[in-house]
Amino acid sequence: MKRIVLAATAAALLATNCFAESYIPFSYPDAAGGSTYLTGVRGVSGGPSDQVYISGVYTPLGSAGTQGLTYQGSITSNTGSWYALNYPGDGVETITSTALYGPNNLGAGIRVVGSYKTGTSAADIGVMYEGPVSGIGGTWTKLQVSGSINTIAHSNYGNLAVGNYDTQLDEGRAFVYNINAGSFSDLTFSGITPTSWTAYGIWQNPNGSYVIAGGFSLTPSVTGLDQGYIVDYDAATGLSSNFRAYNFGDNPVTSVVSHFDGITSDGHDGFNLTGDWIGAGESEEGGLAFFAHVGRSADGSFTAAEWLSLSYPGEGNGPTSGNTVYEKYVLGIYVPDGGVPQGYVATVPEIDPNSLGSVLALGLGSLGLLERRRLKTA
């Protein structure tokens, strides 16, 4: 995997050198040479603030299939408990891969979503697990949009899960799944009709309303202008509001692809997000991860974002991605020099609310957009 040099136009955005307070490796300890992808995080209710649930994906060395992962413990040190958690199937189909995303705290356990594959098809089929984090005694529910080729659930909160499905491989659609009703609906936006769009992150506000984050494209080409978005969602009406599109650095010329992968509250009335972006002149094999902060205006709309570019430090390291976020922590993957993808946790510096719209560099690196889960081929 080649190392990408930032285009001059993109590098010009990174005017200030600012480094994360810390980066720590955070991988499944039983990987034994395999790769670890961290995909989701949520705090443990009633516990210390550093206690979290993490979802992930583990690829055993030499295997083409994946296994789901869950973790419970501290986010500041890899000292908690890891569990391999795989969809068991219905006794008829042979399960070859499981991938888990977006855990949620149920008090006495967790709810985690994702997808699985069988030995007879390359298609992804959505799935949801509810029960102990260990997987012992829990229940599984298949999630599949009618008529879809692939269905992947990315995250869940409250009574909703969000994700993507496709009916043709070059166009993905975002869905909202009502867990209590067991029903799917398309996520749509007022005044905009994308050719392809995703829903990766969901947050439930204290008043019961939801905020969803992801990405969209107005062009049919996968190399077209992609943007991230945030939108409010009313579960009672199924309507969205306060849609706002984002380009990394607030510049669609130098950032041709921007995508939000995760969202969390900032503890006030704003949100912290993470994701990936690609600079002008780069292919989809190259780009960077980021951390972003978005506030609320007096009229309820979302503000401009403050952006921090992320890269796992180390001579010769390859790509870094931002997959999920909790408080001031970003989780994702990096590729060590000569190695396979591994998980990391980055602690980002405090946000200066007076510098919204600025871009700070947290190291420079490259990104292969590994396991982006953006439904281009899945």
Descriptions of predicted regions:
Residues A8, F184, L356-L360, T377:
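A ubiquitous, low-specificity "background" feature that marks scattered single residues
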Residues E371-T377:
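Membrane-interface capping segments at transmembrane-helix boundaries
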